[in-house]
């Protein structure tokens, strides 16, 4: 399926020198079929493709465009920063300012280090947990994505609860390396306790998405995050909350503020730079002081704390800290999801939505709750593919995978919400 011959030709040209025609796999539309849409520009809640077609966007560059695309204050901040120089490889006051803001908003973060991406942040947090504890094993959860570092491209293997070993999910990850990562079912407190009872004194840390955004959107059950906090305290393991997707997105203080849990380390993504390439990790002072140059855990980056991202982030936080910013954002999303649910019910299509702040999930299922990767796999993926293409045809851009969360921004108007609901009504009618 292709929107136009021009899109087909552009994808063919891209595939000549770019593997698969894309620079990140999900963009290839393998999860939904068809040809990727090539985007020319974006503004507010909208994208325009190379054919000039406009879309109401619910991807938001995978989360960080919380103010909408090309917000004038962000553009001005970036332009001003660029005029002063793109990169110095030296400290700037803007790094300090943004670090101060992050630590003030998230009390669990006493020290913070900037990186170039969320993957770098989670990769280094794992290294730091190992360096701090002197242990090797890491616990992660099915359906959670923490970037593409070797330690985390791992699934539960047959030797998980006998030998405490994981198996790679990607070629190129050595089995001897992956065996140090244990993968457990999300929201399974019993499995967590069993794992720690067997291997707790070998476990350096636990990393988790507090709201999983890569098996669509799955929220933690009551007590799950606190159970992780408790076993980490008992076995002196490092509790890492990966807020690359949820940080400043589900609430100003991140998911950790919503669920009232305090991690030892937190990882953050490109939202702290208003969508520019940046990440960060931070947490307890005694752990963070193990990072070079204070300690023996190495981390570095020429563009870490780059001035464009720092100044864009500082400007963005001025908006996020305004009274009622998040309550208005959440209310707008509630309106959208209620309309989508009503449209599906009217069409007689099994459909469910979930919301966490300004993140949302859409599921074609009659299950009561979606609480794990297995329950997500039980959803009707083929129905999602039809829905995706029906909405795209009508000018609504959703993530091209049934396993990705959606996002709303402060730029989405009442008219955009109504437009989206009407597109859904027409698409559901077409799917009957």
From Swiss-Prot:
Membrane-crossing segments per the record: none
Location comes to: Cytoplasm
Cofactor(s) the protein needs: pyridoxal 5'-phosphate
Which SUPFAM superfamilies does the UniProt entry name for this protein?
PLP-dependent transferases (SSF53383)
What the entry lists under InterPro entries is as follows: 4pyrrol_synth_GluAld_NH2Trfase, Aminotrans_3, Aminotrans_3_PPA_site, PyrdxlP-dep_Trfase, PyrdxlP-dep_Trfase_major, PyrdxlP-dep_Trfase_small
Q: Which domain of life is it from?
A: Bacteria
Would you tell me the Gene Ontology cellular component terms?
cytoplasm
The keyword Oxidoreductase is assigned to this record: no
Modified residue N6-(pyridoxal phosphate)lysine is at which positions?
A: 270
Protein keywords: Cytoplasm, Isomerase, Porphyrin biosynthesis, Pyridoxal phosphate
GO BP field: protoporphyrinogen IX biosynthetic process
Named in its record, the pathway it takes part in is: Porphyrin-containing compound metabolism; protoporphyrin-IX biosynthesis; 5-aminolevulinate from L-glutamyl-tRNA(Glu): step 2/2
Give a GO molecular function annotation for the protein: glutamate-1-semialdehyde 2,1-aminomutase activity
- Give me the reactions it catalyses: (S)-4-amino-5-oxopentanoate = 5-aminolevulinate
**Primary location group:** cytoplasm
Report the family membership.
Belongs to the class-III pyridoxal-phosphate-dependent aminotransferase family. HemL subfamily.
Q: What is this protein called?
A: Glutamate-1-semialdehyde 2,1-aminomutase
């Amino acid at each position: 399926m292709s929107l136009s011959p021009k899109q087909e030709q552009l994808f063919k040209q891209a595939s000549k020198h770019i593997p698969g025609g894309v620079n990140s796999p999900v963009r290839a539309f393998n999860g939904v079929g068809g040809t990727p849409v090539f985007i020319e520009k974006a503004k507010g809640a909208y994208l325009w493709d190379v054919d000039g077609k406009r879309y109401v966007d619910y991807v938001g560059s995978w989360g960080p465009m919380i103010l909408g695309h090309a917000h004038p204050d962000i553009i001005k901040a970036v332009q001003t920063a660029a005029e002063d120089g793109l990169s110095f490889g030296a400290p700037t006051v803007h790094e300090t300012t943004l670090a101060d803001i992050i630590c003030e908003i998230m009390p669990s973060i006493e020290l913070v280090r900037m990186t170039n991406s969320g993957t770098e942040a989670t990769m280094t947090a794992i290294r730091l947990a190992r360096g701090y504890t002197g242990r090797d094993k890491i616990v992660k959860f099915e359906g959670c994505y923490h970037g593409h570092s070797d330690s985390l491209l791992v699934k539960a293997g047959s030797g998980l609860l006998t030998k405490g070993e994981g198996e790679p999910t990607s070629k190129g990850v050595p089995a001897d390396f992956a065996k140090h990562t244990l993968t457990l079912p999300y929201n399974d407190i019993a499995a967590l306790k069993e794992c720690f009872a067997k291997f707790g004194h070998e476990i350096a840390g636990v990393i988790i998405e507090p709201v999983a955004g890569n098996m669509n959107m799955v929220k933690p059950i009551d007590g799950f995050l606190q159970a992780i906090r408790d076993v980490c305290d008992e076995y002196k393991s490092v509790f890492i909350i990966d807020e690359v997707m949820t940080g400043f997105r589900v609430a100003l203080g991140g998911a950790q503020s919503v669920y009232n849990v305090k991690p030892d380390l937190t990882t953050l993504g490109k939202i702290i730079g208003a969508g520019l390439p940046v990440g960060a990790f931070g947490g307890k002072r005694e752990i963070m002081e193990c990072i070079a140059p204070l300690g023996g855990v190495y981390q570095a980056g020429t563009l870490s704390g780059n001035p464009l991202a720092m100044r864009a982030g500082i400007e963005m936080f001025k908006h996020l800290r305004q009274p009622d910013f998040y309550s208005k954002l959440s209310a707008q999303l509630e309106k959208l999801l209620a309309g989508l649910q009503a449209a599906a019910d009217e069409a007689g299509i099994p459909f469910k939505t979930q919301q966490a702040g300004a993140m949302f999930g859409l599921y074609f299922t009659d299950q009561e709750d979606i609480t794990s990767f297995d329950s997500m796999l039980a959803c009707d993926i083929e129905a999602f593919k039809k829905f995706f293409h029906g909405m795209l045809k009508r000018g609504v851009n959703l993530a091209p995978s049934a396993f990705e969360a959606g996002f709303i921004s402060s730029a989405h108007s009442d008219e955009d919400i109504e437009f989206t609901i009407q597109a859904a009504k027409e698409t559901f009618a077409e799917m009957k």
